[in-house]
Design a protein with these regions (language model features):
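Carrier-protein-dependent adenylate-forming modules in NRPS/ANL systems
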Residues: 1, 16-135
Length: 135
């Protein structure tokens, strides 16, 4: 009850009044619809790299399956340590497909900040690139 009062105070009325079965489509659902509609269209450009919806869907599905087998899912957190990249986008989508929440970590953050974030969120898994793995 106190939480509902606080949400009302913050102005989040849509969440409080929307019927439970009337939720908007999720990001993975919207992405799947677009990937089915135009699989060979470019979904993302990062520098000289362009990735189609099909490629992004396949890459995020592979990672989502690995994360799910490691326990990622609703109520869980997955840490993502990436610079801005196509891999970061695929990883975010993969985490969302599992139903878990993602914790984005900027590699330029000081170690003490990263340690605090990890200690606070207690992620069940972490994803990064080989060059950032030592962080």
């Amino acid at each position: 009850e106190a939480e509902h009062a606080r949400l009302k105070e913050l102005g989040n009325h849509a969440v409080l009044t929307r019927p439970a079965g009337d939720a908007p489509p999720s990001i993975p659902e919207l992405f799947a619809t677009q990937a089915a509609r135009a699989p060979e269209s470019v979904a993302l450009v990062c520098g000289d790299l362009s990735v189609t919806y099909r490629e992004l869907d396949e890459a995020s599905n592979r990672l989502a399956h690995r994360l799910a087998s490691a326990g990622a899912g609703p109520g869980r957190v997955v840490a993502l340590l990436f610079s801005r990249s196509a891999e970061a986008v695929a990883s975010i989508l993969a985490v969302l497909k599992t139903g878990a929440a993602y914790l984005p970590i900027d590699p330029s953050s000081p170690d003490v900040r990263i340690e605090f974030m990890l200690g606070d969120a207690k992620p069940g898994a972490a994803v990064t690139t080989a060059d950032l793995a030592e962080r």
